[in-house]
């Protein structure tokens, strides 16, 4: 069995692809994989580190507004599709899977033209431009949010969830909090703004740290590498208690997510898949800097189901974040209700469901 996968640009497209590869290997240990991405995307480094064969094509994304740059993008798309056809002819995959990001456009399109079975995976509640385009040519469209189903032909849709969800369930959290100077078994809030951190989130947290010093519950505050030194210097005079741990980055996030009580974070699709799979309540601060405001749409889906509270970045200045945290952690009924709601939205079997969808289209 040979599988070609393409997706990239951000971790939200790459990590689901890797989760799918790992799940496919469980079912078909003999399977061969080829990842097609760009050298400039996040995928180049991550995929190569995983030891998965990698081929690169050159492609850029379309602008949503009228732009001369889009003419160049069309030319790159056609060139990328031509190169993708050659790569696919050489590899001879049984199936080709796209997990989003503009790089998978020419790859999945080329596969469809070569009559190779194809599937695309849409992680967000708002369909990406590439997946909208590809859905006309693919055999199946796997989705994670019911809200996005109107963007695709109903006969092609299969609801699988995000395969990253399966990778956090059942992870041993022993010693996870202690590794960051905190105590196991105590109510703990994790705050993070994505892999690089988020200035808006950081500013809101810094503003309430003096108040947090007087709380019993713990805080694991992840600033992001690029913000860490500046924030550490600004906090030096606060004499923060031992129940507050400030870190630049968390490398063992699945372990930490299994150990915390509440999460304050952005609303990327992968993060939400992990939180709901584990039943972790959240305060979501969607990034306003993403395509079609998809993070807010993702977050509202959780809020609608009582699994999260949403605060937009514009609202942060006039919102007491500490009071919002208090309102959840000091109300056991509310906390448990949010846990249950998050769990009910979760798809811990998402990886297996996606594998099932992939196998169903193979000739």
Curated annotation (Swiss-Prot):
Residues annotated for UDP-N-acetyl-alpha-D-glucosamine binding in this entry: 10-12, 124, 195, 250, 295
Subcellular location field: Cell membrane
A Pfam family assignment: Glyco_tran_28_C
Classification via Gene3D superfamilies: Glycogen Phosphorylase B
Reaction(s) this enzyme catalyzes, per UniProt: di-trans,octa-cis-undecaprenyl diphospho-N-acetyl-alpha-D-muramoyl-L-alanyl-D-glutamyl-meso-2,6-diaminopimeloyl-D-alanyl-D-alanine + UDP-N-acetyl-alpha-D-glucosamine = di-trans,octa-cis-undecaprenyl diphospho-[N-acetyl-alpha-D-glucosaminyl-(1->4)]-N-acetyl-alpha-D-muramoyl-L-alanyl-D-glutamyl-meso-2,6-diaminopimeloyl-D-alanyl-D-alanine + UDP + H(+)
MF terms (GO), sorted A to Z: UDP-N-acetyl-D-glucosamine:N-acetylmuramoyl-L-alanyl-D-glutamyl-meso-2,6-diaminopimelyl-D-alanyl-D-alanine-diphosphoundecaprenol 4-beta-N-acetylglucosaminlytransferase activity; undecaprenyldiphospho-muramoylpentapeptide beta-N-acetylglucosaminyltransferase activity
Keyword annotations: Cell cycle, Cell division, Cell membrane, Cell shape, Cell wall biogenesis/degradation, Glycosyltransferase, Membrane, Peptidoglycan synthesis, Transferase
EC number: 2.4.1.227
InterPro entries: GlcNAc_MurG, Glyco_trans_28_C, GlycoTrans_28_N
GO biological process, alphabetically ordered: carbohydrate metabolic process; cell division; cell wall organization; lipid glycosylation; peptidoglycan biosynthetic process; regulation of cell shape
A Gene Ontology cellular-component term: plasma membrane
Keyword Cell membrane: yes
Stored CDD domains: GT28_MurG
Topology within the bilayer: Peripheral membrane protein
Pathway membership, UniProt: Cell wall biogenesis; peptidoglycan biosynthesis
Function of the protein: Cell wall formation. Catalyzes the transfer of a GlcNAc subunit on undecaprenyl-pyrophosphoryl-MurNAc-pentapeptide (lipid intermediate I) to form undecaprenyl-pyrophosphoryl-MurNAc-(pentapeptide)GlcNAc (lipid intermediate II).
Similarity section: Belongs to the glycosyltransferase 28 family. MurG subfamily.
Protein's recorded name: UDP-N-acetylglucosamine--N-acetylmuramyl-(pentapeptide) pyrophosphoryl-undecaprenol N-acetylglucosamine transferase
Lineage: Bacteria, Bacillati, Bacillota, Bacilli, Bacillales
């Amino acid at each position: 069995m040979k599988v070609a996968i393409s997706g990239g640009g951000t971790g939200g497209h790459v990590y689901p692809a890797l989760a799918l590869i790992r799940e496919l290997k469980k079912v078909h240990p003999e399977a061969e994989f080829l990842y097609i991405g760009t050298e400039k995307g996040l995928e180049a480094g991550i995929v190569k580190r995983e030891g998965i064969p990698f081929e690169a094509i050159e492609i850029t994304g379309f602008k949503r507004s009228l732009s001369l740059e889009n003419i160049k993008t069309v030319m790159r798309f056609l060139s990328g599709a031509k190169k993708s056809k050659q790569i696919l002819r050489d590899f001879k995959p049984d199936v080709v899977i796209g997990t989003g990001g503009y790089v998978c456009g020419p790859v999945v399109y080329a596969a469809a033209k070569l009559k190779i079975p194809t599937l695309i995976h849409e992680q967000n509640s708002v369909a990406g431009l590439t997946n909208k385009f590809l859905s006309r040519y693919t055999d199946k469209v796997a989705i994670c949010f019911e809200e996005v189903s109107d963007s695709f032909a109903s006969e092609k849709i299969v609801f699988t969830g995000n395969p990253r969800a399966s990778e956090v369930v059942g992870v041993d959290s022993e010693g996870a909090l202690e590794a960051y100077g905190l105590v196991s078994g105590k109510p703990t809030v994790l705050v993070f703004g994505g892999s690089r951190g988020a200035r808006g989130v950081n500013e809101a947290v810094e503003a309430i740290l003096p108040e947090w010093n007087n709380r019993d519950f713990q805080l694991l505050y992840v600033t992001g590498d690029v913000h860490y030194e500046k924030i550490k210097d600004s906090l030096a005079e606060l004499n923060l208690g031992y129940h507050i741990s400030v870190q630049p980055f968390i490398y063992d996030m699945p372990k930490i997510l299994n150990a915390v009580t509440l999460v304050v974070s952005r609303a990327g699709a992968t993060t939400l898949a992990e939180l709901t799979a584990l039943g972790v309540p959240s305060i979501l601060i969607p990034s306003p800097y993403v395509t079609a405001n998809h993070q807010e749409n993702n977050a509202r889906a959780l809020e609608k189901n009582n699994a999260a509270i949403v605060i937009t970045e514009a609202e942060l200045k006039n919102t007491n974040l500490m009071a919002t945290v208090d309102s959840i952690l000091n109300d056991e009924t509310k906390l448990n209700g949010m846990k249950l709601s998050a769990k009910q939205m979760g798809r811990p079997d998402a990886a297996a469901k996606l594998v099932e969808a992939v196998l169903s289209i193979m000739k």
